[in-house]
């Protein structure tokens, strides 16, 4: 807060406010203490105005003590509450509107009147202060009618009327104290001052990525000029921010734009104390240059070269390269000042400097922990934007969320409101029906409810005023989780249980394959507990095994357990990448080729969903060179698409499936399933498949994968479990048509026997169920048999499948086992 702009009496008011907070044993200085401070200065305009409304110091003290009472013994430094900070800001705004250079007690009172949510506002309400009349009385006591900023500014700068209508005076705004403080940019501001002090070509251009604080440096220069922290050459200069869109707007006829811009240049040259700031400098190129007319950049070039016009530009690296560097004559007139992204430490300092402004706006307390969490989490998880902009946005949105959450009307008040509305409608209906006795009863009920509502509302407001809302790390994590979809909030008990039992959840869909399920589950738990390497994906796996043992199904089951839907994973079928050039489909077509603007199938999906399961199915079908592009994904967790954007893979689980080596196993008569030859050696199968994998893929690719898992052979018992699972799916589908189907154990055993194939794994079971159950049921339905609403029992008598159709009963009877 700018205490240097306070009058002596206003400074004493703040000192009295601090004393009152100490007297009442309160830990913060709030609006009520500011009001008590005003009453302690009886000679001030504020106290005199309040006395004219019969509000005395004793009454205010009594009301404050009644509303919030005395606190416990307080030890430590007193801080202003966000509402008190807001009042000081509003008082400065009032002083500016009244064209006063200093803030007095009267402005603080006007600020208290405008802040309608603090304890002071409730004191005014309880003492029946008419806010409108009080404000008018203050203005009358000052003997100074309010004028608009616009009129004041015009009266101060009559020598540049065109410029004033098209540009904002940053020095005036800085003098008013409404610009945010600029922290940690001393080096860049010094370099700008050095360039501005040159004799010719004294035009700095601030170049940097979006959101690193280029515009803030121009504002920092304006603040330095106001605070006399600049050399003699720049003292009393005005920094005017010119928007090229405003200059072009309304120029209907040819020559109007050039005339307007020339007039601005003449005014700047005559004034001699104007530094022009053009944000988005690249808009100069081509502005107003329709139908062969001269554009803005060519009009400004001569004045820029001679030093007659001082201009600060700001633009991004890409726009500077595309627009400014392309025009060498324009480029040489500007001196580039590189604005780099601040470090994490610098960003924390910047946010701490801005904290007062955001606390005053949102009326909450922002802790140091929340600031540090905002910087670290945004730096780690929001990779396509830059500090400090993304961290500031995170603090702003999280503060807004907390503020809205804490000030939402509670349910009990809403219920009473609805009840009042209902009773009111009933009363009106009774009056229309001329049931006056009933209407009188309803009126009494309405009055009682309204009184109850007021009491509940006052109680809620008291609770709100006594409670200091704070922004915590958890609030920051919630917002960034909403931005990115990555779960960052603290693990609650339910989620903890879910993660610890992830193996059981996956085994509900994937029968057997304990090693694969355990590896995947451990990787997910490591990531959620915050122990994974922050520079690599959550996990990368290669699943090996013959066809039909559950490799792809495990990836689907993982996607369902994490996102609630097995279609939520990003699936890339590698059989579509048999040609070498097909790799462009992953990262996007090169410049000049069709589809360059569409982006890559993989990179675009991961940019939209950075927290996902990525399945590369049947990797041995793809061209070997395709996998070179995955090397940096597996090692560093990022991939650059054809537009130069870095896509973050650090929050993905990468699963690759392969049947490599299955043919050789078949030749060796190792089918990969339990059957007649139960003595097959899993280690022999594993070694054979890994050997084939090493022959098919490069060592630098395999070395980057976290785990290579060879899936186990499926036993007969596991095949029976799979049959049961498939039958349950069929039962669910038929239940939608109101058909109840029961499949006996004998029928299931026969299906498992018919569907078992050592070469094709578990997939033939699907065909066996289609052949034995679905085909016959479909014929029964189409033959005109009314089986809807009935119970169908499927059994096997040792020779063929039997279908028994019966009426459904309340008791489910077990079918006879023949």
UniProtKB/Swiss-Prot annotation:
Lineage: superkingdom: Bacteria
Alphabetical keyword list: ATP-binding, Chaperone, Nucleotide-binding, Repeat, Stress response
Region (Repeat 1) location: 6-71
SUPFAM superfamilies on file: Double Clp-N motif (SSF81923), P-loop containing nucleoside triphosphate hydrolases (SSF52540)
Sequence segments annotated as region (Repeat 2): 80-144
Residue span of region II: 471-662
Residue intervals of the UVR domain: 417-452
Binding site for ATP: 208-215, 545-552
GO BP annotation list: cellular response to heat
CDD domains given in the database record: AAA, RecA-like_ClpB_Hsp104-like
GO CC term, one of those recorded: cytoplasm
Listed InterPro entries: AAA+_ATPase, ATPase_AAA_core, Clp_ATPase_C, Clp_N_dom_sf, Clp_R_dom, ClpA/B, ClpA/B_CS1, ClpA/B_CS2
UniProt GO molecular function: ATP binding; ATP hydrolysis activity
Domain spans labelled Clp R: 3-144
Location of the region described as I in the Swiss-Prot/TrEMBL record: 163-410
Family statement drawn from the similarity comment of this UniProt entry: Belongs to the ClpA/ClpB family. ClpC subfamily.
Described function: Required for growth at high temperatures, probably by acting as a chaperone during heat shock and targeting heat-denatured proteins for degradation by ClpP.
The protein's name: ATP-dependent Clp protease ATP-binding subunit ClpC
